[in-house]
From Swiss-Prot:
It comes from Pectobacterium carotovorum subsp. carotovorum (strain PC1). The keyword DNA damage does not apply. The lineage of its organism: Bacteria, Pseudomonadati, Pseudomonadota, Gammaproteobacteria, Enterobacterales. GO terms for cellular component: cytosol. Residues 5-127 form the Glycine radical domain. Gene3D superfamilies: 3.20.70.20. Signal peptide: none annotated. PROSITE patterns: GLY_RADICAL_1, GLY_RADICAL_2. Acts as a radical domain for damaged PFL and possibly other radical proteins. This is Autonomous glycyl radical cofactor. InterPro entries: Auton_GlycylRad_Cofactor, Form_AcTrfase_GR_CS, Gly_radical, Glycyl_radical_cofactor_GrcA. Keywords: Organic radical. GO terms for molecular function: formate C-acetyltransferase activity. The keyword Transmembrane does not apply.
Length: 127
């Protein structure tokens, strides 16, 4: 469980009045804001904070789970030839819609550079 705290007393005076999210399961603390030394979103072992006293801060929402290094997948069910023909003859494909960064977009509304990029990233020889 994650607990929000404001440090009220500490051996390190830079920690006083700083706000943290404590994850007791992992014995980690995430800095929300501090005067100096620690930067926002920095994660440290709770033991690095030393001897502290704090007051709990109610959290109105559950902390967002952050997945670093994740990937985004856009699925476009098309043949390469269809997109290449749409580049050459856009009038034949006025309703051709693809997914780009999670959004639906008309292929013909993309710049030529963006169209080439979509074709290059959508079709690969192997994984």
């Amino acid at each position: 469980m994650v607990t929000g705290i404001q440090i009220t007393k500490a051996n390190d005076s830079a920690l006083i009045n700083s706000f943290w999210l404590l994850d007791e399961e992992k014995s980690q603390a995430r800095c929300v804001c501090a005067k100096s030394v620690y930067s926002e979103d920095q994660i440290v072992p709770v033991s690095d904070l030393g001897q502290i006293e704090y007051r709990e801060i109610p959290l109105e929402i559950k902390p967002e789970v952050r997945v670093e290094g994740g990937q985004h997948l856009n699925v476009n069910v098309l043949r390469r030839e269809t997109l290449e023909d749409a580049v050459k003859h856009p009038e034949k494909y006025p309703q051709l819609t693809i997914r780009v960064s999670g959004y639906a977009v008309r292929f013909n509304s993309l710049t030529p550079e963006q169209q080439r990029d979509v074709i290059a990233r959508t079709f690969t020889e192997s994984l």
